[in-house]
Amino acid sequence: MTDIPHRKFAFDTVFDDHGGVAYTAPRVKKSFTPEEVEAAKAQAYAEGERSALVRTEQEAAQALAEVAHAVQQAFGTLAHVAHEHREGSAMLALACGRKIADAALTHFPEAPVTAALEALAREVEAQPRIFVRVSPELEERTQQALENVAAQIGFQGQIVARADGAMAPAAFTFDWGDGRAAFDPDGAAQRVAEALEAAIAAEGLHAEPLFT
């Protein structure tokens, strides 16, 4: 026996209380004219094109967003590299400067103390005596250099250079009773390095932009 699929009864027509037709289900059209078929095909094609265009635009927008994200990451990396380059360049310049300063102090160890006397000329001009402490090997050389500078600036007081074994080469202390001055090449170099490191740390990654 062949099983015939049972079709559920559908209430296609609804009557009102007076026996009139209140609702009739629309009949499904089973045949179409060639014009209707072509119109349906054209509509389906247009809807398909619109759907494909929307998908393409969405994919393009997503691709652009990914490109923008990649560029942003690249800029961050470049900024970090540039900061490291600036830091390395600054430290290299500092090291070169230290080498040059060391060489200059080796050849002219009395230069800092004579420069100090010239800078303090007005402050010490009325002092009767200035005591200067320097490293033992520079005592005589410093005494002669300071006397020459004193004659040039018109200082009439007495300058006394004394040897101090605790003083590094080119280091000195000035003592004129009312005041005191001192210079230590190593300490000065350390302060410069610390100031440079602090400036680099404060700058961080907020320096001038790489691209404008």
Swiss-Prot record:
Query: Which Gene Ontology BP terms does the record give?
Result: bacterial-type flagellum organization
Q: Which domain of life is it from?
A: Bacteria
Keyword set for this entry?
A: Bacterial flagellum biogenesis
Q: Which NCBIfam families match?
A: PRK06032.1-4
Q: What is this protein called?
A: Protein FlbE
Organism (species): Caulobacter vibrioides (strain ATCC 19089 / CIP 103742 / CB 15) (Caulobacter crescentus)
